[in-house]
Amino acid sequence: MKSINTLIPDIYNVMESKEHDGDLSSIAMQAGREVEDAIKDAFTPREDNRGLRMSGIGRCERAQWYNYKGYTPEAIKGEVYLTFLQGHVLEAVLVALIKLSGHTVTDQQKKHTIEGVNGSQDCTIDGELVDIKTASAWSWENKFKESGIADDAFGYIKQLSAYGKGDKRKK
């Protein structure tokens, strides 16, 4: 049985060896559908979502309060939308590679509600709750050091903890 601890070298190995687990066509088709959905979603007008979401954990509390109270936020710029789209596309490709490298992926986009706050986790890999994140070179060097994300400025640990609470996880 594979372990999340070997995930990255396993992905590199499957890319080098071309020896994969699972049905390549089926996994590639699923990734393609997810990329298609991400592109369509990027061009779908946004609904007015004034509620709190688990993905907002770690965001500026003042900005969340203004949003929740109905104040009009600044318009999101094209480059920000492109960053979001890149993250969704890369997530689809990475999940495909994770499956092809023999790891178990479950609970993709599983919905959670904790005390009225909604969220959807990315997936569970080899039994471990995972939220797939992309990072620029600057973010990687400055926020994701070997010591981890101890200060958790983006609220990633709190967000994962909320999903874990939804699953009644102990750790």
Please place each PLM-identified region on the residue numbering:
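Active-site phosphate/pyrophosphate- and oxyanion-stabilizing loops and adjacent acidic/basic residues
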Residues: 161
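Substrate-binding beta-hairpin/strand module that engages nucleic acids
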Residues: 165-171
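Metal-dependent nuclease catalytic cores that hydrolyze phosphodiester bonds in DNA/RNA
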Residues: 1-129, 136-154
